[in-house]
């Protein structure tokens, strides 16, 4: 059923949080949930009854972590390990454990370490717990979001300024995309869910709640801000028209609605970095996923938590998969405010020159008009996957790696 109180509250919270952080100005958002929610409520109740048997089967498959682990190939493993440079006795935090590919690689490089494995996905947490049985002295599994990480780390006995390395591997994992009932992929039909936390928070809105409740202006704002979709108004209008006839509850149902807003020739007109055709609804799915999971706010909070818990000289490695994530990471590492409107590359040059001219002044926090620099970049330019890596793992084609040392 549609979660009215929570949905209204989280909708307002998202707005206030975005305006406060200044990362993106989404403009004026609606304050009321549409009356279509009532019709959706009744429809969803019947849908849940019809789908119970199928979902139980999927859940049992989801618990088979051995199978799920094989579905995810970690991206840029060698580069991640080199940037983290694990040494004997050090302590690390993998903030996006997933199926543990990067964690295993780090342990293979240096087994005599302690590694805290954090993930918001209960399936990933189950895999981390299973792996901790094989590495009882090394791995500590933690279930939670980036925004909960500080409290969870303190509870686990980790003090600020003590970690030697932190890894963030953002976006969806293959095991999430390839599990239809999670509702992340437009290629496999399933309930329109998209919650990375799974069923941990029953009142948390799903993607179906979003597309069936928000008005056209709000939907267009989400598509524009989180999907960078230039046809946001057209797609939002198509969603409004379709849900007036029937509630939108399935992934391929939403994909078909988006496709129907364009001529057939446009369905796969867009190309990815490998020049392969991509579905016209890809950006729409990205936008709703980011909104449902509050991903960009979570990322910014995660970066601040990493900075707080890393020791001076500790390494931060962040893998992103779209420009919104990379932009936040880049600005954070360069000390550029999220509200900065100057061209980023030009602004970067100003900061670098300022660092050379008055390095000591910045360190002491003397009035310079800028925050003291907190990071030294390991690489001057962002790292991307090698051609061979992309051939082996096409899903990692858009990966960007940024690494820095805390000053």
From Swiss-Prot:
Primary localization class, coarse: mitochondrion
Cellular component, GO, one term: mitochondrial matrix
Modified residues (Phosphoserine): 358
Residue ranges, compositional bias (Basic residues): 397-407
Region of interest (Disordered), residue spans: 44-63, 386-407
InterPro entries, per the entry: RsmH (IPR002903), SAM-dep_MeTrfase_MraW_recog (IPR023397), SAM-dependent_MTases_sf (IPR029063)
Annotated residues for binding of S-adenosyl-L-methionine: 100-102, 119, 146, 169, 176
Biological process annotations from GO: rRNA base methylation
Span of the signal peptide: none
Compartmental location: Mitochondrion matrix
Domain of life: Eukaryota
Keywords: Methyltransferase, Mitochondrion, Phosphoprotein, S-adenosyl-L-methionine, Transferase, Transit peptide
Enzyme class per UniProt: transferase
A GO molecular-function descriptor: rRNA (cytosine-N4-)-methyltransferase activity
EC number: 2.1.1.-
HAMAP family xref list: 16SrRNA_methyltr_H
Record's function text: N4-methylcytidine (m4C) methyltransferase responsible for the methylation of position C839 in mitochondrial 12S rRNA. Involved in the stabilization of 12S rRNA folding, therefore facilitating the assembly of the mitochondrial small ribosomal subunits.
Family that this chain belongs to: Belongs to the methyltransferase superfamily. RsmH family.
Name this protein carries in UniProt: 12S rRNA N(4)-cytidine methyltransferase METTL15
Source organism phylogeny: Eukaryota, Metazoa, Chordata, Craniata, Vertebrata
């Amino acid at each position: 059923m549609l979660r009215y109180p929570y949905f209204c509250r989280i909708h307002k919270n998202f707005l206030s949080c975005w305006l406060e952080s200044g990362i993106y100005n989404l403009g004026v958002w609606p304050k009321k949930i549409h009356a279509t929610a009532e019709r959706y409520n009744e429809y969803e109740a019947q849908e849940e009854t019809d789908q119970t048997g199928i979902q139980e089967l999927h859940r049992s498959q989801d618990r088979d972590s051995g199978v799920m682990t094989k579905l995810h190939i970690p991206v840029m493993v060698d580069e991640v390990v080199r940037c983290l440079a694990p040494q004997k006795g050090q302590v690390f935090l993998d903030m996006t454990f997933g199926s543990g590919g990067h964690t295993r690689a780090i342990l293979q490089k240096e087994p005599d370490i302690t590694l805290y494995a954090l993930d918001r996905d209960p399936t990933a947490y189950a895999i981390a717990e299973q792996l901790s049985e094989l590495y009882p002295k090394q791995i500590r599994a933690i279930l939670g979001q980036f925004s909960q990480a500080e409290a969870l780390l303190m509870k686990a006995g980790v003090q600020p300024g003590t970690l030697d390395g932190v890894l963030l591997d953002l976006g969806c994992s293959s095991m999430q995309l390839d599990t239809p009932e999670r509702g992340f992929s437009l290629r496999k039909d399933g309930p329109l869910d998209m919650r990375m936390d799974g069923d941990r928070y029953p009142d948390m809105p799903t993607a179906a709640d979003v597309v069936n409740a928000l008005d056209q202006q709000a939907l267009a704002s989400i598509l524009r801000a989180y999907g960078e979709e230039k046809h946001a108004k057209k797609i939002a209008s198509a969603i409004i028209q379709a849900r007036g006839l029937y509630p939108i509850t399935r992934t391929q149902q939403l994909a078909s609605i988006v496709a129907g807003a364009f001529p057939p020739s446009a369905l796969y007109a867009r190309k990815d970095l490998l020049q392969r055709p991509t579905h016209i609804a890809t950006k729409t799915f990205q936008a709703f996923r980011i909104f449902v999971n509050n991903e960009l706010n979570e990322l910014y909070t995660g970066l601040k938590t990493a900075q707080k818990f890393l020791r001076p000289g500790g390494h931060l490695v962040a893998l992103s998969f779209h420009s919104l994530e990379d932009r936040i990471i880049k600005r954070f590492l360069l000390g550029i405010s999220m509200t900065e409107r100057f061209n980023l590359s030009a602004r970067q040059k100003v900061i670098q020159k300022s660092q050379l001219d008055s390095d000591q002044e910045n360190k002491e926090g003397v009035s310079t008009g800028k925050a003291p620099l907190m990071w030294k970049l390991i690489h001057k330019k962002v790292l991307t996957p090698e051609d061979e890596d992309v051939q082996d793992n096409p899903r990692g084609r858009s990966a960007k790696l940024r690494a820095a040392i805390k000053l």
